[in-house]
């Protein structure tokens, strides 16, 4: 300990350099961890707010929110999900995630879905404003929670409107259940069906792993070199 304290006081610059390097690497890891979590929420916050226990896709072997289409079943809630372009009342276009549920369903913000849409605040539309999606008009009846799906703000709409927009007879993209059902997958596993979610999260976590390894190598290399330089002092002790 005496040698270590002496080295710190006599080689402040060297010690400060390695301490600063470790601090910067730590900061980078923290920032990247926050970025990974933030991007994940931008993909999944709407689904997490619904908080189903099971998600049923058209094909259990092909988990995809893009291609799945399902019919309504007793005890299960159909959820439609699509990425669309929305035109606001002032003519401005905005990318939006259209999520549909049956009328009367309670949304994460506490609103009850009716014939009117419920918009995320980040869409910057007002209550009573009429918006257009794929040539179909709908009035925004309320502003809900600021949720996102696949990196787009959410516009909650009734199932009938989603079917018109998508030109489909299907009742939704997936079925949601508050209990385990045959053919369903847990909510966390369903995230792999989001476009680019798995690759995005995998890449960021791989970078985090490399940063941890680099930080460990830098610290070990520094301590090894420093110890070897003081071998004689340690031998005397």
What do these predicted regions represent?
Residues 1, 5, 33-34, 59:
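N-terminal membrane-targeting/anchoring modules of bacterial envelope and secretion proteins
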Residues 24-35, 215-223:
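Hydrophobic alpha-helical membrane-associated segments
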């Amino acid at each position: 300990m005496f040698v270590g304290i002496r080295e710190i006081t006599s080689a402040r610059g060297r010690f400060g350099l390695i301490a600063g390097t470790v601090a910067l690497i730590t900061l980078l890891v923290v920032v990247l961890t926050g970025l990974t979590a933030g991007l994940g929420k931008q993909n999944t916050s709407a689904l997490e707010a619904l908080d189903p226990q099971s998600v049923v896709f058209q094909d259990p072997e092909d988990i995809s929110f893009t291609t799945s289409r399902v019919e309504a079943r007793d005890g299960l809630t159909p959820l439609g999900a699509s990425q669309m372009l929305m035109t606001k009342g002032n003519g401005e276009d905005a990318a939006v995630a259209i999520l549909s549920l049956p009328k009367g369903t309670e949304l994460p913000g506490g609103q009850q879905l009716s014939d009117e849409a419920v918009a995320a605040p980040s869409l910057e539309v007002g209550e009573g404003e009429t918006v257009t999606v794929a040539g179909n008009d709908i009035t925004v009846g309320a502003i809900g929670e600021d949720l996102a799906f696949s990196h787009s703000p959410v516009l909650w709409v009734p199932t009938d409107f989603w079917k018109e927009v998508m030109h489909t007879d299907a009742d939704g993209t997936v079925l949601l259940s508050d209990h385990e059902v045959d053919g369903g997958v847990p909510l966390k596993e369903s995230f792999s069906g989001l476009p680019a979610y798995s690759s995005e999260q995998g890449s960021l976590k791989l970078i985090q792993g490399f940063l941890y390894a680099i930080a460990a190598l830098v610290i070990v290399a520094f301590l090894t070199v420093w110890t070897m330089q003081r071998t004689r002092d340690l031998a005397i002790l």
